[in-house]
Amino acid sequence: MENISRRTFLKSGAAAAAAAAFPLSAEAAAPAGTAAVSALCPTQYGPVQGKAQGSHLVWYGIPYAAAPVGDARWRAPQEPTGWTNPLDCTAPAPAAYQVSSAPIGTEDCLRLDVYSVPSAHSRPVLVYLHGGNNQTGDSLELPGGDLVENDGCVFVSLNYRLGLFGFNSLPALCPEDGGTGNFALLDIAKALDWVRENISAFGGDPANITLSGFSAGGRNVMACLTSPLFAGRFQKAISFSGGITFSDPDAAARQIAAALAPLAVEDGRFADENAAFAGLLTPDAAVREWLCSVEPSRIASRMPHAALRMSVFPHLYADDVVLPKAGFAAGTLHQVPLLLLTGSTEFSAFALYDGWFASE
């Protein structure tokens, strides 16, 4: 799609997808006496205070899980601590920790944004996963105001762990008793649970959830379609510019160990990088303890800027825990309606720098 911005493409595609998936007639009539959705809204963990923007309401940065910090850095997301007083959700929350031109964001990132309108009742819910190679991006990539005002849905966009915080298959972080390095997918599953348990208070229908995403987010949607973990967690799917590429967790662990070995030597954990490489590939609890203590900027900077075929940053591990080793061939694809969207020239920039594609 030439001469069109990323956000324009997303907005146009999202509007078209919403029109197809959520006809305005899909919204059930509210029973007599039903209260309007308010900017002060209850959740199972405590009340959240949003704000009006034009004709819609928005709540930014609602916690759907506890902060994955310290020893929880590479663990499944846990329940957030509840609160009693209204939580201020009137300003955008920081992005998940990431490195672009400079480090930005926070590890306390397991938060989501909700957009709705006061009159919403049992509306279809569109959950959106942002793009960015699973290394960059945030929940603000696609604002949902136009969608909820014009297309009859409630819109949810979420942040989840990125880079080596979201995908890390080192043995010390993925014990053999069913552990997985697909932490970002665990975050997405947890966010979908939050939506199912809380979205009715925002005017959404918890039994009518569409999972959508753009680019890396679209690939995550396709991964969720194959994962037994996501059975029953959503009813429809939309992938914008997404594909399906899984990686070998063992090969990825070797690549991650090589990337992190210099840090282990710097911190005096091993005598040299060869010893560090070997040590990082063991399930030693001391490896986990050290990794959880390292400053996030040092970790995030070790594997920047993902490339085609995941050659720089392998992720979406086919570990037979969250994702089947056989991919689509495993026959575990969830039988839900799937809408695929793409741009006519979206791959051109990637092809310029990839040896598999010859220029004419």
Predicted ranges, named:
Residues 2, 8-29:
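N-terminal export signals
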Residues 10-13, 28-182, 206, 344-347:
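Non-catalytic accessory segments of hydrolases
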Residues 159, 212, 238-241, 342:
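Alpha/beta-hydrolase-fold catalytic nucleophile elbow
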Residues 179-199:
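Alpha/beta-hydrolase active-site loop
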Residues 197, 231, 241-359:
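Substrate-access "cap/lid" subdomains that shape
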Residues 204-212:
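Alpha/beta-hydrolase fold nucleophile elbow
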Residues 213, 217:
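Gly/Ala-rich beta-loop-alpha elbow adjacent to hydrolase catalytic centers
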Residues 218-229:
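Short glycine-enriched nucleophile-adjacent loop
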